[in-house]
């Protein structure tokens, strides 16, 4: 089998590339996905409110676990990643958050990455998006990904939480992806107008999968990339339960889009990575690239949970006897409780003046429950997810075996810097202050978690050690740049090799301020033009907010 391009991984970036590259009818593409199809009849991945379900099994989730995390009481922590067409966009929380403009401007300060500035990237965010209220300087009106805005009157807790943030002295913003990210406001979601999850399988592949020049193989577990000298010339994979490898050749390029955990694994198995690590497993060295699998970053978050004194939370939706009605409303009308992910309000703040742009993110949820659906509080409640955004802690992903089915060693080194502890202490104390504003007086009952007895630095630190969880935002393991630990250049081409690019969240040099999915899709769109040799879209001229030393919050 021969193709122009072979794409490994049908996730948030891979599906963008598959769709854009096959717009040219003369270009042939093979898209390999280790998981299965995105079954449209499966409410677990299609109903926004069911977002906890795909994380519970292994049909749609790789369900990786970390090594014991040394600064988290040696907990082995969850590291869920999407499996199936759509990748992590098939199982994520559907928050459409792009990050802060200064994240990208910060990338662009690296020599060779100048064209990754916010204004260079904004046209690609717009190209990918159809926002339900129409386009403007910041948002697209005819892209493949449906974005739904929060509508007034959904739940009084959303507005009360935003108002509480404002009463605490923080800014209000109408659009967390618009002129000003900093502040509290409604949150956009990747949900279709019919109340379905807008994964990249739905948005992109639906328009491309019938093209004769696109071949999609599911249940295709990539074993390794085939090289001829320093040139990538094909891919070998295992189909289904078969132990006999299948191979295909790429006339132009192999495009690795397997995500921040799997992309470095595949490179390492293929002979690209730290020579020392590869020697351990007798893998013939193709190219010594010490940065492969290093620079691993993530967002850590914790929940502050409160009783709700009024019966306005989503608690009744957790009762089995209410679920048939909710399911029917969603199935037949695309409306009701099932049609939202219920992360409809949030915010970004600076916890201290020394941060030039926000370093803390909030998601509000009108029910008290763990992200994966466990430990639901048996009463009306609400919670606030809070976490730091640009931790200095760095980890790694390293293979433990040549067997593609064997999970790698994943270590994030969460909370390994004093800055991490300071940010979380600040975040908990600021959150309590926000929660005690007048806007929440009629709703706020007792603090369920961490609980009012948890006050000193030592008590807060111990709570974080035992209860902070991943926000499922791993990135950075094949970072873009030109220093000795960089893996790819500014166009995603792997240093020292030919015919091989990495296009996914692993190339982010530094994690962004917010959820990763929207930016991963943008990276796919921008790289698709680079791969095709097309001129970049014209730079945006939109304005954007920079704090420039303004106070963190207004004096009361």
Curated annotation (Swiss-Prot):
It comes from the Bacteria. It catalyses: choline + A = betaine aldehyde + AH2; betaine aldehyde + NAD(+) + H2O = glycine betaine + NADH + 2 H(+). GO terms for cellular component: membrane. FAD binds at residues 4-33. Its EC number is 1.1.99.1, 1.2.1.8. Its cofactor is FAD. Pfam families: GMC_oxred_C, GMC_oxred_N. The active site is at residue 473. Pathway: Amine and polyamine biosynthesis; betaine biosynthesis via choline pathway; betaine aldehyde from choline (cytochrome c reductase route): step 1/1. One of its GO terms (biological process) is glycine betaine biosynthetic process from choline. It is an enzyme of class 1 (oxidoreductase). GO terms for molecular function: betaine-aldehyde dehydrogenase (NAD+) activity; choline dehydrogenase activity; flavin adenine dinucleotide binding. Keywords: FAD, Flavoprotein, NAD, Oxidoreductase. Involved in the biosynthesis of the osmoprotectant glycine betaine. Catalyzes the oxidation of choline to betaine aldehyde and betaine aldehyde to glycine betaine at the same rate. PANTHER family: CHOLINE DEHYDROGENASE, MITOCHONDRIAL, GLUCOSE-METHANOL-CHOLINE GMC OXIDOREDUCTASE. Belongs to the GMC oxidoreductase family. NCBIfam families: betA (TIGR01810), PRK02106.1 (NF002550). This is Oxygen-dependent choline dehydrogenase. The lineage of its organism: Bacteria, Pseudomonadati, Pseudomonadota, Gammaproteobacteria, Enterobacterales. The gene is betA.
